[in-house]
Every structure is written in structure tokens, then in C-alpha cells.
Amino acid sequence: MPRSIILSLALISATSLIAQTAQTPTLHTGADLQQREAALIETAKTVPTGFAVGTMDNYGNDRTLLVVRLHTGDAERHQFWADQIYVNHGDLILVYGGTMQQERSNGTAPGETLGSGIEGGKEIPLHTGDIIHIPAGIPHWVKVATATSTAYLVFKEKDK
């Protein structure tokens, strides 16, 4: 085998190895989540929406958010993003499908809309430890029971 091919293969292998070792796993401990959640609860108490969100990770085509809701907020539709929700604590009802009411652009991201609610959607009760996947383009609405709060992780993945 010619020397230039051997050197090229060695360079490709080394570059691949460097790329693999440059990316390290990201760990969020239970204690870290509790701290972040406590801070977001305090923030949510200070705003009329009773909603606070913190970005934990952002890798471009996927990201992780920690969300706290003290009461029901807007319905959402994400044209380009699928959501996977893990309920960290609390009970909520997820309404999906149907028709968004008073749908409007959220003004901050292309393809993202908000609404005052959903009519004719299906309701799924979710509890601590539950996980649900919401494909891109599906309207969804998190309803929180009165006088309770909920915290959940949202794993967002860009629809390709």
C-alpha cells in the first residue's frame, strides 16, 4: 500500500479519535436538578405566567430544558422540534392534537406558535416519572391542577 494512503488513513483515524474524545458526556445529578428546580420555582412565583424555564443543554439539533409551571399556560406547536417530556414532579394533563385557539407566532423562533388552549384534543394525565413523546407539528398544552406546581424536563430534538 502506498505510503500516502497509509498516512491518509492514519490521519483520518486520528481525527476520528480526537473528535470522539473531544465530546464528553454531560452529567446532571439529582442534586443539580433539585437546585435548578428550586431556583425556577422562585422565578415562576415572580411572574404573572407562573412559568419559568432553564436551558440545561443546547447542542444545536437537540437541547434539554427544565420547566416549572405553577399554573396552566399557553398551548404550543413547534413546526421543527419534537418534544419528549419527563415529569420530574407533580401531576399535569397533557392535551394534544385538536385545534389551537387564538394561535399566534411566539415572536422569538420561526415555526413556533402559541395559543390560548386546544379545542377537541385528547387529554392524557401525566404523573411523576411519566415520559411522553410529542412529534413536531402536533399542538400540545400542559394543564396544571389548581394550587399545585409541576416540573418537567423537555428533551427537544430538531425534526430532520
Question: Which functions belong to the PLM regions below?
Answer:
Residues 125-130, 136-160:
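Ligand-binding loop in jelly-roll beta-barrel domains
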Residues 18-80:
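A short, N-terminal "cap"/entry segment at the start of jelly-roll beta-barrel domains
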Residues 1-4:
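Positively charged n-region of N-terminal signal peptides that target proteins for export
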Residues 74, 102-104, 160:
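A short local loop/turn or secondary-structure capping micro-motif enriched for an aromatic residue
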Residues 76, 83-86, 123-124, 132:
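His/acidic/aromatic-lined binding-pocket segments of jelly-roll/cupin-type domains
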Residues 6-16:
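Bacterial N-terminal signal peptides
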Residues 99-136:
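Short acidic-glycine-tyrosine-enriched beta hairpin
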